[in-house]
Amino acid sequence: KLIRPSQGSVSLFHSTSKSEWTHALKRVGSVIETPVALNHLNARQNLRYYCKIHHVPNPDNVIDEILDTVGLGHTGKKKFRSFSLGMKQRLGIAIALIAKPDLLILDEPINGLDPVAIKEFRQMIKKLSEEQGMTVLISSHILSELYQVSTRFGIIDHGQIIREITKDEFEHLSEDYIVLKTNQLALASRILQDQLHQHFKVVNSDNEIHIFDKSHVIKAIVKELVKQEVEIDEIYYKRQDLENYFTQLVDSERR
């Protein structure tokens, strides 16, 4: 325990007391953002080292199984220091799997990964969940990737869980919204707010405005913007994604 709790309580596998937690924590594995391993050892040697720490019997059989699960069976004598970021992440997860956890906690596991490594990560997480029945808790700000591997979402703002929702519930609630692309974001925003009274979000990085109030159809919005001499690059309907849902929810909570 790093700090004493200020309030509230935590239950892990129905365990709440200090003595129960000691046993419950043995059922948990974790990788906190940056995987830790010995630079001068290869994947198999690193796993053998951690198997000794955990007093794992017949470690070679366990190591073969884990390397196959995380897709590192081909790395041979390659040292950890020479691994790509994706390979390091997979070895970190492999180390966490040595104790055969029922719960695996991953903090920002896809930060810095390339598209191929992200796809491999998704496949690995689904495999752990579907084939081994493992619960995987992922903390990440890359919501589009979370959506592809998760079945339940907890949305946190300023340290508080403000909403829990299943994937099925989200898909039932999600709606189309209007995407407006223009270089005149300030002028378009002012018109949407003052003349059309729309609920919207500005995405400066993409020169986009996302319009959520569908009381006005695209035709009416285009008509008013053109009248006010706003240059429209694109305007179209799009299905709401988890990122927009998150932003809307947080904005409404802060009002």
Which residues fall in each region the model found?
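Conserved beta-strand-loop-alpha-helix hinge in the C-terminal portion
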Residues: Q160-K181
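Short, charged/small-residue-rich alpha-helical element at the C-terminal edge
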Residues: D176-L249
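Structural motif detector for alpha-helix initiation sites
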Residues: A43, K167, R239-L242
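ABC transporter nucleotide-binding domains
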Residues: K1-I138, L143-D157, I161-R163
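ABC-family P-loop ATPase nucleotide-binding domain
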Residues: S252-R255
